[in-house]
Amino acid sequence: MAGSREIRNKIKSVKNTQKITRAMEMVAASKMRRAQERMKKARPYGEKIRNVAAHMSRAYTEYRHPFLIERDTVKRIGIIVVTSDKGLCGGLNTNVLRMAVSKMKAWEAEGEQIEVCCIGNKGLGFMNRMGANVISHAVSLGDAPDLERLIGAIKILLDGYNQDRFDRVYLFYTRFINTMKQEPVMEQLLPLSDERLRASDRPTGQRGVWDYIYEPEAKPVIDDIMVRYVEALIYQALTENIASEQSARMVAMKAASDNAGNVINELTLIYNKSRQAAITKELSEIVGGAAAV
């Protein structure tokens, strides 16, 4: 009976854990829907500012912004790694960090220096443990991040590129595909590639040539637009990463709940067999005693 009591305690413990994982699954599902809405709402702004940046980069040929200039040699690289602040989201953080570390090792093998900006507690902790050169970070941003809290961290890299401290800047994050699929990606953030701007020179359905009147002059306007555009790219990546995080957490908690159910079934079967064996033994002892009398 001591064995049966121990099994009952295990069943009770697993059931309590299952209640927690089911609650976390429902919370993650609710947060996932809100994160997807924020992700969709951020896209129109990104598209509009990309249209403006694309046109201005072509229309005003007297000035070429540093973000558009390709460096002859690449010796110093800045990377932005976007992860979650919390765990229990499957392999989401592991996959993007594995990709980042793989690229970092390849660059270091070529003699390139790497400096890191971390967005998210998980990435910051990992990079600090591996001894990476972390120059800035933004953590505990919550499920609805404010761009203002990001600017301080990413401004260090943007200013560094302007000052020739970096030759390239890359962005690592998890792209949201659908509820069941998210994939880690690496994108070149700076210099801005033609692929990013090529399709955005003119809005769909609009004809004719754009022309702007700059007040007081074009250079400060272009400088500001380019910075805002890069910030929009990073913010869009962050919203996709949050949507991916909540989706991965919902799937992970559902899997945990299902596994808990399987464990409960197995323990219940073991308990029933143990109880049956104990009853059979008692009956055998009673029958044996009666026969002896």
Curated annotation (Swiss-Prot):
GO terms for molecular function: ATP binding; proton-transporting ATP synthase activity, rotational mechanism. PROSITE patterns: ATPASE_GAMMA. Gene3D superfamilies: 3.40.1380.10, ATP synthase, gamma subunit, helix hairpin domain. GO terms for biological process: proton motive force-driven plasma membrane ATP synthesis. The keyword Cell membrane applies. NCBIfam families: ATPsyn_F1gamma, PRK05621.1-1. Belongs to the ATPase gamma chain family. This is ATP synthase gamma chain. The lineage of its organism: Bacteria, Pseudomonadati, Pseudomonadota, Betaproteobacteria, Nitrosomonadales. The gene is atpG.
